[in-house]
Amino acid sequence: MPGRSTVRALSAAALAVLLGLVAGCGSGVDGGGEAAGTRTITTDKGPLEVPADPQRVVVLNGGLAGYMYALDEPPVATDTRVLGITNFDGGFPPAWAEEARAAGTEQLPAGDSLSIEAVAAAQPDLIIGGGQGITAVQAAQAYDRLAEIAPTVLVPRTLTAWQDQMNAVADAVNKADAVPPLLQQYRDKLEQVRSSITPPQGETVYIASFAGEKTYVIPGDAALPALGQELGVTPVDVVARAPGARLASTGDSLEISPELLGEVANAPNAIVANAGGRSLEELKQDPNYAQLPSFRSGNVWEVPATSYRPDFDGAMATLDLFGQMFASQDG
């Protein structure tokens, strides 16, 4: 991918400085073994010795695999499930399918439980799991068995910002030096889009559309609203409006009763993140949504699942979407 760094090494001291602010995932620590081909990093499970230059990485969460390609460190095998994009039917997510095929990445079987046998068959020298979703739960439950196969790093599920997730993955594979150029690409595009749009006036409520009939809104500090706020799109504080509602353990969705939707989502604008649920057009036929101010006025937009929990590529694509949705008419 153009502009991606392929530089290999960063000193352990610089690595610690770069990643020291990443909450919950730790940063690389000089374990004195790098000359012997290993290094020690800090994880939620404690200090962990990992390869200094891993060659056969297996990724257990499709939501984390995209970072590996962004870091120019394609895994030998990966789970391919990404919420709202791919599921048990298999197939690589479109965002990195071409890179996965070019690298010869194998697909791990998807199921209700993690296939330890398939992971072992890939002969990994490093395993990366965790993150969010069912695959994160599976990896956590199987951690001890996975650790018998190869050093296993679980990205904390509390890391919902794509920047923090990418830092955690980069730390694990010793590619922290590849992160700053990617972040600069993002900042450059952010400034480009910000200068070319007119954000909607007033607050914007973010609605998550998942499979099933339950009603969800997205907290203002989750990944998608946080990205929008960088562009001047002000999110509604839905948590404050529904203090008794159930916040997901990952912190990026809030389940509310349909009766509360009119109160919680009472904003002049709305953005619907379609993560495998009803489309915007279908929601418009639902009286609970149709009565919202944003739906009545037409100030409602739809973004795909890749924007709900974006990785690096998803964040870049979402910036483009915001640029299209809110393009300045005088520019």
Show where each model-derived region lies:
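C-terminal motif of bacterial Sec signal peptides marking the signal peptidase cleavage site
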Residues: 19-24
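Structured C-terminal subdomain patch of bacterial secreted/periplasmic proteins
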Residues: 171, 264-331
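Basic- and aromatic-lined ligand-binding clefts that recognize polyanionic substrates
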Residues: 56-68, 178-243
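Bacterial signal peptide processing site
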Residues: 25-29
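A short, structured surface patch at a secondary-structure boundary
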Residues: 65-115, 126, 131-132
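Proline-aspartate-enriched helix->loop->beta-strand connector
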Residues: 116, 123-129, 261, 266-267
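Extracytoplasmic substrate-binding proteins
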Residues: 47, 143-213, 316-331
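Bacterial N-terminal signal peptides that target proteins for export
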Residues: 1-14
